[in-house]
Amino acid sequence: MSRKSLIAGNWKMNLNHFEAIALVQKIAFSLPDKYYDKVDVTVLPPFTDLRSVQTLVDGDKLRLTYGAQDLSQHDLGAYTGDISGAFLAKLGCSFVLVGHSERRTYHDEGDALVAAKTAAALKNSLTPIVCIGEYLEIREVGEHVSHCQNQLRGSLAGLSPEQIGNVVIVYEPVWAIGTGRVASAADAQEVCEAIRKELGALASPQVAETVRVLYGGSLNAKNIGDIVAQQDVDGGLVGGASLDGAQFATLAVIAAGGPLP
């Protein structure tokens, strides 16, 4: 089955709302409309930028989409500092990151919470981009595949096969996040193939063939082509390179199969 590539830009805690507008304008200028037929492009700004991005995307009728970097497992109530998926949906978000390694590491988010947030995203018609991945010490002892499959099961616990079909999965080896190190194309394929196999066990092989599985970790114009060319890699979650509009657009063009404009 042919799955449309997805390139998602995770801005992390960078850029105020003025800077966000400038970056989205740069991406739109650098990425001609014809490429959107082959690749979906989304940006994931900080919460405080979302309204400005929405106004620009809607006003200029841009084809890229946008989403958030996290959400609450709750819809409403006395949860100080939380952001509801219902609020994100009202802002026109299409996607939301769930379980990024930085949330798991710095905020102690475990698989059960990730599963609850994933369910909350789906409840509010948001597409959750669920992140899983291993630390270097796990890879070095050869347990990276089983670790990722276990993490996937925990992060999707309680979801129906139909719900699983509406999720995007990201394999982000923690040792490659912001380090400049990157998994080889073969490394990415090995784990993404195992993820798809596990999705087949959790839902069905048919559902697994429809789910987009991305790679994340120090992606750039030199390495993304080989990685997204792998059979089970359907795009990328881009970190630092997503803060440069021209570079991010180039990654999207490569994921679309080129040629560069």
Swiss-Prot record:
Domain of life: Bacteria
Leading EC class: isomerase
Location of the protein in the cell: Cytoplasm
Keywords of the record: Cytoplasm, Gluconeogenesis, Glycolysis, Isomerase
Major place of residence: cytoplasm
GO biological process entries: gluconeogenesis; glyceraldehyde-3-phosphate biosynthetic process; glycerol catabolic process; glycolytic process
InterPro entries reported in the protein's UniProt record: Aldolase_TIM (IPR013785), TIM_sf (IPR035990), TrioseP_Isoase_bac/euk (IPR022896), Triosephosphate_isomerase (IPR000652), Triosephosphate_isomerase_AS (IPR020861)
Residues that coordinate or bind substrate: N10, W11, K12, G178, S218, G239, G240
SUPFAM superfamilies on file: Triosephosphate isomerase (TIM) (SSF51351)
Gene3D superfamilies found in the cross-reference section: Aldolase class I
Record-stated family: Belongs to the triosephosphate isomerase family.
Function statement: Involved in the gluconeogenesis. Catalyzes stereospecifically the conversion of dihydroxyacetone phosphate (DHAP) to D-glyceraldehyde-3-phosphate (G3P).
Protein name, entry field: Triosephosphate isomerase
Organism in which the protein naturally occurs: Mycobacterium leprae (strain TN)
Lineage: Bacteria, Bacillati, Actinomycetota, Actinomycetes, Mycobacteriales
Gene that encodes the chain: tpiA
